[in-house]
């Protein structure tokens, strides 16, 4: 399906180095963005969407989601949570390990099998149109170099430290190194223990492990000591992920430290859900608003922290609005009845943005109304469609 989105007030690029893109029109074809500019021709498009003066941004990337199998979370006994996150503007979820699978295995063969099965289960399954990167191997004692080669051979590219049966968090270090040697993106639980049997992991542990990402560095949900945060900022180049289901005060502290260090590209926004804190379809939007309103982060930079920053660390071809990127686009606006007049001023005010349309893989999933955010001030609409679908989402 070839899709044109026109009449866009502002394009939020997702690129932290250039967060506003020039233009008012985005053209999508064959699941990719083919052009970003001004006054594009919609005549040869199957679908043309009038943004109605709303802003466009890349689909949000939630880089901390506890996937299991299917669109179901045993932790909160909830069906359909991933499809619901689409209505919060989230178009990509990245597994933080399948640790919530009931009775999950703990031996090397079992954790490999779990990661491979999850990876392959979501390879072609897109709940609500969402792209799910599942299959994050839980690092356990006994894994050897050949295991990581096998995992990589099956397409597993994520590894999680923090839930294994190690005597001390320092013991994760050689396992993280093995995973990195085989091309896996490595993440480590940071902060106090989150589930029975896990342990607290602080800055010294993380620095010894040298993962790609310090997961929920603000606490998941319990934070490490304040003195540890400057160490991670100043003694490493590890990406620092802040999560909605964590400590807000330390989220703001992380943002302050990274901004002062000129390292805002290292800050990643995620939710750490579903967990004991629940299911949060709008969690990404809330953390973006917290940073913009309380941490002096420019709202377009907060958008980049939830999109392009995640994409760069996780090596994804999404998270930015640019020709050649994956065609995941969200139309956003201030919510109806509020004090602000556009999406960016809403974030700066501490409000969430309203979601007016979501397109994933170049396919409109709904246009005009989100099931989960308040109504937008302006209304996106399908101006032209040559397919038997109006994408209105009126059933919401």
Model-assigned labels for residue ranges:
Residues 74-82, 140-151, 196-205:
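Short, acidic/polar
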Residues 42, 51-116:
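Metal-associated gating/positioning segment near the N- to mid-region
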Residues 8, 31, 53, 64, ...:
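Divalent metal-coordination and catalytic microenvironments
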């Amino acid at each position: 399906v070839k899709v044109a989105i026109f009449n866009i007030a502002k394009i939020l690029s997702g690129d932290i180095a250039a967060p506003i893109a020039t233009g008012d029109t985005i053209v999508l074809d064959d699941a990719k963005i083919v052009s970003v500019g001004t006054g594009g021709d919609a005549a040869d498009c199957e679908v043309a969407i009038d943004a109605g003066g709303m802003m466009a941004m890349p689909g949000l990337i939630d880089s901390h989601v506890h996937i299991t199998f299917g669109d179901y979370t045993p932790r909160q006994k909830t069906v359909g949570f991933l499809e619901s996150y689409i209505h919060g503007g989230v178009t990509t979820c990245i597994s933080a390990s399948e640790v919530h699978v009931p009775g999950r295995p703990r031996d090397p063969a079992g954790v490999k099998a779990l990661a491979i099965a999850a990876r392959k289960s979501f390879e072609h399954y897109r709940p609500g149109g969402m792209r799910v990167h599942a299959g994050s191997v839980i690092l356990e004692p006994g894994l050897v170099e050949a295991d990581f080669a096998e995992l990589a051979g099956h397409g597993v590219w994520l590894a999680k430290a923090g839930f294994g049966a190690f005597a001390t968090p320092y013991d994760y270090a050689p396992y993280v190194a093995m995973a990195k040697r085989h091309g896996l993106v490595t993440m480590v639980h940071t902060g106090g223990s989150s589930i029975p049997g896990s342990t607290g992991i602080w800055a010294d542990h993380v620095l010894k492990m040298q993962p790609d990402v310090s997961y929920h560095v603000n606490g998941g949900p319990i934070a490490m000591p304040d003195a540890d945060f400057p160490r991670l900022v100043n003694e490493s180049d590890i990406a620092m992920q802040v999560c909605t289901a964590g400590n807000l005060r330390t989220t703001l502290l992380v943002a302050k430290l990274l901004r002062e260090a000129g390292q805002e590209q290292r800050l990643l926004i995620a939710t750490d859900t579903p967990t004991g804190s629940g299911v949060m379809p709008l969690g990404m939007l809330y953390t973006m608003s917290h940073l913009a309103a309380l941490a002096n982060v420019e709202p377009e930079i907060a958008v980049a922290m939830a999109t392009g920053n995640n994409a760069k660390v996780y090596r994804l071809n999404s998270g930015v609005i640019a020709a050649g990127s994956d065609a995941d686009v969200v139309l956003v606006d201030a919510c109806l009845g509020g004090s602000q007049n556009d999406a960016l001023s809403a974030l700066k005010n501490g409000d969430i943005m309203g979601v007016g349309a979501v397109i994933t893989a170049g396919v409109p999933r709904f246009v005009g109304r989100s099931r989960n955010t308040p109504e937008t001030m302006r209304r996106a609409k399908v101006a032209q469609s040559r397919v038997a679908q109006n994408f209105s989402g009126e059933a919401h």
